[in-house]
Regions:
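Mature, function-bearing regions of proteins
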Residues: 1-253
Length: 253
């Protein structure tokens, strides 16, 4: 049975077109049952739900961003999806807040049925301008999904093309890959992989000491990447105005 845990691993961003560039960095992620966040907090002194701590998950940093409980928002998306009634447990894969700060380029929600089979995936994409867009996609026999890009993420990519998501059900190891394709040419590939660790105070503290200020590192890496791309002459796209939250439910029914 799938259980809440940590995953420690690596993120790789590989830009392929119109120029080549690569960025990789070490990370750790929380993989948690969204109905058990308070229970996890009661068992781990270094983790809290909606309260300041060394590590935390805040409802306001997900979904509509207005403090709506994560589980209410995500279960609402699941129930509106085709075969959503088959989903019995949902886990979120994300960076936790570190000392109150977080930026999650992508939070992934995995929906499992009573037999612990993946039935639904929700990809919650954030940009650095305060926008958020969720893609709700059924998970069947294949471990590849596709969604048209409808959201401004990078100032170096227009809102065009489609995403291909490649994933495996998290177990002792996990892996997730995303490819952005425009006009049949791959533009960007991103990967995250990790090895499972028990979710306890010892591993939380060890993760902090190994990769301190995780999410500051993530946002710094994003901006360093942007400076490199500007230096190489890549053209900027105009960013959107204001914070938004939109949902593409590709499994409604």
């Amino acid at each position: 049975m799938t259980e809440s845990c940590l995953y420690r691993g690596e993120v790789v961003h590989r830009r392929l077109n119109p120029l080549r560039n690569e960025l990789r960095y070490k990370v750790f992620n929380l993989f948690a049952d969204i109905d058990q966040l308070d229970a996890i907090a009661s068992q781990c002194r270094l983790f809290s739900h909606n309260r300041f701590n060394l590590f935390s998950v805040m409802d306001r940093n997900h979904g509509p961003g207005d403090g709506t409980p994560i589980r209410d928002h995500v279960w609402g998306l699941a129930r509106a999806a085709r075969d959503g009634a088959e989903v019995k447990r949902i886990f979120m894969f994300c960076y936790p807040s570190v000392l109150g700060y977080v930026f999650n380029p992508l939070t992934v929600y995995y929906g499992f049925d009573a037999e612990d089979r993946l039935r639904l995936m929700i990809y919650e994409v954030n940009n650095t301008f305060g926008g958020r867009h969720s893609y709700v996609i059924p998970a069947g026999e294949t471990l590849t999904q596709r969604a048209e890009k409808h959201f401004h993420v990078s100032p170096f990519n227009a809102v065009e093309g489609h995403y291909d998501f490649h994933f495996s059900a998290p177990a002792a190891k996990m892996a997730l890959g995303i490819t952005l394709t425009v006009d049949e040419a791959p533009v960007l590939k991103a990967y995250v992989s990790g090895t499972r660790l028990a979710l306890n105070d010892a591993n939380l503290l060890r993760s902090f000491l190994t990769i301190p200020f995780l999410t500051l590192k993530v946002i710094a890496a994003i901006h360093l990447q942007a400076l490199r791309l500007l230096w190489k002459g890549l053209r900027l796209e105009r960013p959107p105005g204001g914070a938004t939250h939109q949902v593409d439910n590709l499994s409604e029914g």
